[in-house]
């Protein structure tokens, strides 16, 4: 778009420390900024404008420390009142009538529900890997356990806060990762070629060379199988070497597999809500010291990106 000098990005999940220069068809440069998610930073740009022209800029990401900022009385009052609200049968958590409300929560305040301590994190719990994160692995493991599925899918959401090793995992932390209006889960049978098609389609949404055809988000999170991805290949050629972990055998196009997942936007499934499945999984699998053992993160192998600086520090295999 011609005539724009700067775009201050407001919808992002990655803090970008310096503006990105983008050249338009006329040769002019537009500076694009993004300051990250969850209120961690405020993007601050000082512009030197003289004679009707932009002469220069100074940009920084100012960190936000909540213990250095005075609480807004009106907001604190609102949050306190909300925390005192009592959960009842009029609460609607699910689009499925079976799970409109949770009987186990009736009579408890919102604060009591959200502050429940579930287990202690033994390692960093994070969401924002391009292909997988430890929170994602936990969600996929919970789905696989709930439904005894061969494969589990979880959306590549780009939000959710991290927990440090040794911190308690509370119900609020689980909700931070799962709280959407379409949290119902499902179990269904799929042929191997359908599973491969899902992986290929999501990968195309992310890595389509034409940015106007990209859908955003991260790669779908997968439990129960491993695969190799070539981001720079074309649709239908990006996903290879797909192996079912439980059998250590290749995915077969016409074989049928049990697949679990959640976050269906259209016709809603009727399964339990994902946050209850994750909560129950944590409570069942923590040890006597309240520590939750975490399964190894199922990072895919990435092909053809070794020299790409954006993949620096990748915890999976690069070939």
Predicted regions: what they are:
Residues 29, 35-319:
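Catalytic centers of hydrolytic enzymes
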Residues 5-15, 32-35:
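Active-site neighborhood of phospho(di)ester-bond hydrolases with catalytic His/Asp-centered motifs
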Residues 2-4, 28-29:
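Glycine-enriched alpha-helix->loop->beta-strand junction motifs that scaffold or abut catalytic
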Residues 1, 16-25:
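Metal-dependent catalytic neighborhoods of phosphoester/phosphodiester hydrolases
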